[in-house]
Amino acid sequence: MXXXXGYLEFDGARQQSFLYPFFFREYIYVLAYDHRLNRLNRNRSIFLENADFDKNYSSLIVKRLILRMYEQNRLIIPTKDLNQNPFFGHTNLFYYQMISVLFAVIVEIQFSLRLGSSFEGKQLKKSYNLQSIHSIFPFLEDKLTHFNYVLDVLIPYPIHLEILVQTLRYRVKDASSLHFFRFCLYEYCNWNNLDIKKKSILNPIFFLFLYNSHVCEYESIFFFLRKRSSHLRSTSYKVLFERIFFYGKIQHFLKVFVNNFPASLGLLKDPFLHYVXYHGKFILATKDTPLLMNKWKYYFVNLWQCYFSVWFQSQKVNINQLSKDNLDFLGYLSSLRLNPLVVRSQMLENSFLIDNVRIKLDSKIPISSIIGSLAKDKFCNVLGHPISKATWTDSSDSYILNRFVRICRNISHYYSGSEKKKNLYRIKYILRLCCVKTLARKHKSTVRAFLKRLGSGLLEEFLTGEGQVLSLIFPRSYYASKRLYRVRIWYLDILYLNDLVNHE
């Protein structure tokens, strides 16, 4: 992103915050294409549905698209003819994908430049380890043990597209770009709402950009009201969210909110409140009573219904008591567990025992959901019995083995933070036996005969990588003991959720 931003630093259009001229410059499409490939290489599973965009990209297509945008009448085509009437061998949907990627990348670059300028003069420590998904778990272990209740909320969508356009007004100052953006949405798609899952046929980068804009908008309102209703000042809001005319926009909302709910801001005061957003959801943790959690619950329901015009049912907001309920958080089932301890204290000639109870956050592996993901991808049946992967039998033996080993290591890597690894060993067993059955099916042999012919060395690949990592972390004597079975390890290099973890 820093390299791409350099192309925009000395551009006259950027000095005036005009984005519309960038749609007619070829080098911007090259930057967008390179940015897309970088994200594709980091997380290929998200962008597999749009592989045609990367295969068909060329400078000649960009020139044709620019010429077509100069003649906007040629862009206006009925929705039913979106995949028909190909222009120079390409459908209109393909050209819309190019425009959507370009718009998302341009606004993202501009927002990163603006965000970088807000950090100037502020002494902020940058830690790349905080980018890891696992970095949030040590924080929760330290904080959630003091809390009683957690509000688990699924961020609602779809949302009306016109509200998204209005939201982008506070990031994009150029009216021409906003008009062009609205034109593309309504002329090409003719949608009323944004639904990422149903519109997955189009570009995911573009829809993730729209979705993140929607989340950023509601979070800015939430943080603003939280700051007004709390005695503690929040410094992160000022640094992380730069809003243009935000206070002018929020003034009307606050007036309506306070008039309709006169006691809400006072009742929502709670200095011990933690908010964590993740994967289309967020949790709100507090040590207060269920009454306060219900007030926050109906506050969010009214916020989305009144301000964002999204019909949101209160049943989608779950209030979990950590001592009794499991919290489904980033692929783990987390709950508070009482760990009794007996401490012997001796003072002079007298000794006595002290019973102490330590509250500990227990993160368990959701074996049922992972088996459901494995069954969905044809690694096993719904009961967890391994089956052969028929679609991989045309590949080479080394390719099949390496792919199974990589999947097994990724799952083991992600769930290393659980103390009870019995479920993890069961998942690894399913993958190993599935690998053997796949290879045996390819060679038209039985599993017993195949293992007898190749020996046990075939499965050593599943253990080599994990053993090397753990041997570097722990002493050899400790690594060889059974105590390693209950050791929790949080890795700080996990940036994305695995598809098997992301099962719904």
Swiss-Prot record:
One of its GO terms (molecular function) is RNA binding. The keyword Plastid applies. The keyword Transmembrane does not apply. InterPro entries: Domain_X, Maturase_MatK, Maturase_MatK_N. Keywords: Chloroplast, mRNA processing, Plastid, RNA-binding, tRNA processing. Its main location: plastid. GO terms for biological process: mRNA processing; RNA splicing; tRNA processing. It is found in: Plastid, Chloroplast. GO terms for cellular component: chloroplast. Belongs to the intron maturase 2 family. MatK subfamily. Usually encoded in the trnK tRNA gene intron. Probably assists in splicing its own and other chloroplast group II introns. This is Maturase K. It comes from Alliaria petiolata. The gene is matK.
